[in-house]
Structure formats: structure tokens, C-alpha cells
């Protein structure tokens, strides 16, 4: 973490912090600084992960274009693996939607018909009372 800072420099920073902030505020300041450092590390790791994912997607796209140019015949094992990964990803994306649509459609249909009838009856009864 402190690659360019030696022990003496850390000791000097600690003593200066103790003199400037005092013994009561120094622990709070150290905690807040370590929190900032953790947040920056998390952000950096998040950006790194997103870039790696985008590079992997870009590599898969380029492999797919190479496969299209070769006519999907006599593909190298590397290109075939990329195509298989794309097919698996497409299937995994489609599967959750198919599973969710079936139960929600059957469970929402009876519940929607019953409430829609009740408010209709209430609405038709309310205008008669307000006109009298």
C-alpha cells in the first residue's frame, strides 16, 4: 500500500497528525482516510472488472466475425470455443425470462380479474349516490 513511503516517513506523518489533530480527533481522521482509500480501491476494482468484461465481449465479437468470414466451417478450436460461449450466454439470458413468464402469467390472470370487477361495481354505485 505504501510502496514509496518508508517507516520514518509514516512515523513523521503520524507525529504531525497527532500534533495537528490531537489525540481525540486523530483516530477519527485515520478511520475516515482508510474509508476513502477502501472506496477508491473498490471503484478501481469495479472499473477494472468492467473493462475486462468489455474486452472479453469485444474478443468474442471479433472471434465471431472471423468465424463468419470463414463460413462457420473448418473453424479453429479457439473460434469454436468462442461461438460455444456465445451460445451458452444467449441460452442463459433467455432461460430466466421463460421461467418467470409462465408462473407470473398464470398467477396474475386470476388476481387481475377479481379486483377489476370489484372496483367497476363500486364506481358505478358511487355516481348514483353523488347525484342524489
Swiss-Prot record:
The chain crosses the membrane at residues 2-22. GO terms for cellular component: TAT protein transport complex. Residues 68-132 are annotated as: Disordered. It is found in: Cell inner membrane. It holds the Pfam family TatA_B_E. Coiled coil: none annotated. Gene3D superfamilies: 1.20.5.3310. InterPro entries: TatA/B/E, TatB. One of its GO terms (molecular function) is protein transmembrane transporter activity. Belongs to the TatB family. NCBIfam families: tatB (TIGR01410). Part of the twin-arginine translocation (Tat) system that transports large folded proteins containing a characteristic twin-arginine motif in their signal peptide across membranes. Together with TatC, TatB is part of a receptor directly interacting with Tat signal peptides. TatB may form an oligomeric binding site that transiently accommodates folded Tat precursor proteins before their translocation. This is Sec-independent protein translocase protein TatB. It comes from Shewanella woodyi (strain ATCC 51908 / MS32). The gene is tatB.
